[in-house]
């Protein structure tokens, strides 16, 4: 652009207060860009939008009894249980928090450990051996040895630049409606084809009566090509119509999502919806709904350590099941830790039971219709490469009407684009029903 001519005249020096405001605004802008680790796409943000964002953050970030700084930059607020975001939900105004479900799945009991996970859930010495057993994964914020006090729950603090990475304030913390299918066969699983979401999953029949599911999931840190793509490995517990607007879904696992978290670390996550991802539900604790009860596990916090090729393998065990007496859907982590629950009031179809369970991986390919993304699923290696290279789900189980855990013997598998990501299932004694899955995305067979 050319220079702009100005009229001659005398210019008065700006008042000191004006200079101070300019410095503050510039400092805020600089800190936003740097702290987001280049994942926040800076753009001009109006004062009204910033005010709306701040009001939203004030609702999510409750006053903390104690604040813990994680080595990875996260801030963990220890919030009193009765002050957590879940209880802001209009259906939960008079909700009484359960400490533990009155009845556990019968195969293996769990217990509420306010002091954390058992030693069996974290084995630093675990390695690739003949028995193919993985070691449990922990969370990075535990490394500084500080813990939330009893009576509080750890909640990852949300910052302004976390919201700025989303398309809008409404979209923040939610799955995009564009990921929903317009039509689906009656017996098809909850997958999305042709719009950028790709899967490699195992699933049960659509007509089964299911009251929960469990699996142990290998943890990796797959590479993500662009900020608006993600890679996750999770369990889906589903009920309702796949073709309508009443699908109920409860989900949990690990996820790498630069847009949601601002980095490329694998993180423990949850999700729920009661209306096919339209208006209800969210990731983690980014809206009212999920009630956390444990003081050691922070949903949305980074998992550590992670697996590496041909070396130590680490995994997490996720259990989701319905309390047969009160109807709440509980989440267990590891062998013996209750994390919290989704109250029955949140759901329609899941207030009764689930009709399908899925286990597996999902990625977003933002280049749909063009060159395929190089975003990896699982470890970034194909299923046939096996233990130590390919990612796995092992010991797939479901909870039946008697509140008993049993191994899943009959599953179907699906990979929409097996040249990019695939899946291979099997069965043996130590791992029960299990499968390897994943892939590198873009490669000579997946251009």
What do the predicted segments below correspond to?
Residues 2-447:
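Exposed, interaction-prone regions of secreted/extracellular proteins
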């Amino acid at each position: 652009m050319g220079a702009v001519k100005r009229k001659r005249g005398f210019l008065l020096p700006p008042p000191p207060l004006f200079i101070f405001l300019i410095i503050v605004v510039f400092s805020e802008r600089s800190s936003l860009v740097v702290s987001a680790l280049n994942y926040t796409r800076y753009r001009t943000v109006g004062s009204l939008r910033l005010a709306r964002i701040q009001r939203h953050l004030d609702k999510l970030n409750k006053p903390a009894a104690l604040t813990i700084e994680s080595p990875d930059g996260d801030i963990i607020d220890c919030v009193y249980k009765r002050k957590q975001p879940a209880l802001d939900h209009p259906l939960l105004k008079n909700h009484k928090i359960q400490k533990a479900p009155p009845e556990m799945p019968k195969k293996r009991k769990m217990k509420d450990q306010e002091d954390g996970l058992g030693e069996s859930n974290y084995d630093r010495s675990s390695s690739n051996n003949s028995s193919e057993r993985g070691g449990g994964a922990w969370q990075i914020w535990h490394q500084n040895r500080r813990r939330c006090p009893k009576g509080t729950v750890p909640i990852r603090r949300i910052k302004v630049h976390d919201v700025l990475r989303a398309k809008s304030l409404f979209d923040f913390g939610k799955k995009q409606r564009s990921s929903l299918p317009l039509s689906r066969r009656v017996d098809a699983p909850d997958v999305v084809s042709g719009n950028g979401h790709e899967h490699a999953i195992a699933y049960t029949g659509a007509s089964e009566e299911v009251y929960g599911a469990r699996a142990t999931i290998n943890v990796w840190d797959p590479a993500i090509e662009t900020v608006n793509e993600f890679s996750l490995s999770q369990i889906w517990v589903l009920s309702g119509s796949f073709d309508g607007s009443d699908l109920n879904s409860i989900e949990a696992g690990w996820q790498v999502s630069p847009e949601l978290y601002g980095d490329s670390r694998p993180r423990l996550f949850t999700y729920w919806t009661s209306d096919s991802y339209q208006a209800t539900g969210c990731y983690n604790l980014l809206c009212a709904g999920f009630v956390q009860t444990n003081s050691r596990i922070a949903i949305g916090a980074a998992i550590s350590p992670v697996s590496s090729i041909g070396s130590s393998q680490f995994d997490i065990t996720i259990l989701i099941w319905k309390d047969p007496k009160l109807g709440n859907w509980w989440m267990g982590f590891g062998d013996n830790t209750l994390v919290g629950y989704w109250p029955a009031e949140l759901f329609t179809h899941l207030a009764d039971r689930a009709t399908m369970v899925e286990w597996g991986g999902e990625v977003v390919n933002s280049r749909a219709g063009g060159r395929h993304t190089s975003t990896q699923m699982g470890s970034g290696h194909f299923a046939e490469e096996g233990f130590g290279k390919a990612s796995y789900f092992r010991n797939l189980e479901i909870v039946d009407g008697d509140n008993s855990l049993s191994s899943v013997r009959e599953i179907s598998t699906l990979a929409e684009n097996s040249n990019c990501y695939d899946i291979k299932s099997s069965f043996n004694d130590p791992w029960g029903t299990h499968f390897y899955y994943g892939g590198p995305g873009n490669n000579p067979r997946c251009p």
